[in-house]
């Protein structure tokens, strides 16, 4: 390192010992951050789903509405048996969660666009959808930090939506939004369980 002037920064750089590039990164901190965010997200998932349903009209807004049979091929389901879930390795657990929240960020953007057209006068719903998308993106970043700390490869980002039929009817768009907001809640619940397990395993 060449220093033409004896500036304070230059002198400081000469006095400080070099950083070791091989210093291990503890996963406990990013796991704790991700767990805290997932818990915060979990507190808001039911409100998001109920707000969404209330703005779609019948049958969505009818008391007790539920359609678990509705699924999207572009969005992985969070449903998994306890035995299968508990037997997962860390890499698989994190990879599946990251893939799901990547898909959710893209689907929440689509649902937000749909609702801007279907319910332009509903700022609360649009704000909640936008906040959910940003939190999902934040959790994605936390997941990537955990995988880096554990020395695991980070899956490349993919276009999970593919080609979206722009001619979808209003009812089809409402169904799509219902599935996305429902699965957002289910995946958040699963992420809390995933991260609680990792938190106990890698506690500082």
From Swiss-Prot:
Protein name: Cardiotrophin-2
Keyword annotations: Cytokine, Developmental protein, Glycoprotein, Secreted, Signal
Keyword Glycoprotein found: yes
SUPFAM superfamilies linked to this entry: 4-helical cytokines
InterPro entries named in the record: 4_helix_cytokine-like_core, PRF/CT
One of the GO BP terms on file: neuroblast proliferation
Pfam annotation, one family: PRF
Cell compartment(s), UniProt: Secreted
One GO molecular-function entry: cytokine activity
Role: Increases the platelet count associated with splenomegaly. May have an important role in neuronal precursor development and maturation.
Family of the protein in this entry: Belongs to the IL-6 superfamily.
Glycosylation sites (chain numbering): 44
GO terms for cellular component: extracellular space
PANTHER family: CARDIOTROPHIN-2 (PTHR21353:SF8), PTHR21353
């Amino acid at each position: 390192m060449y220093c033409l002037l004896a500036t304070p920064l230059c002198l400081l750089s000469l006095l400080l010992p070099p950083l070791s590039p091989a210093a291990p990164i503890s996963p406990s901190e990013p796991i704790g951050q991700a767990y805290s965010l997932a818990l915060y997200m979990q507190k808001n998932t039911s409100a998001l789903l109920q707000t969404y349903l209330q703005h779609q009209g019948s049958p969505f807004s009818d008391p007790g509405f539920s359609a678990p049979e509705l699924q999207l091929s572009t969005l992985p389901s969070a449903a998994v048996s306890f035995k299968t879930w508990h037997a997962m390795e860390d890499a698989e657990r994190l990879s599946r969660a990251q893939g799901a929240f990547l898909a959710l960020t893209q689907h929440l953007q689509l649902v937000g666009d749909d609702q801007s057209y279907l319910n332009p006068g509903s700022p609360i719903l649009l704000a909640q959808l936008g906040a959910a998308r940003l939190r999902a993106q934040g959790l994605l970043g936390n997941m990537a930090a955990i995988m880096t700390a554990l020395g695991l490869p980070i899956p490349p980002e993919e276009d999970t939506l593919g080609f979206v039929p722009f001619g979808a009817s209003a009812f089809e768009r409402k169904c799509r939004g219902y599935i996305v907001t429902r699965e957002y809640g289910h995946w958040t619940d699963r992420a809390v369980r995933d991260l609680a397990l990792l938190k106990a395993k890698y506690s500082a």
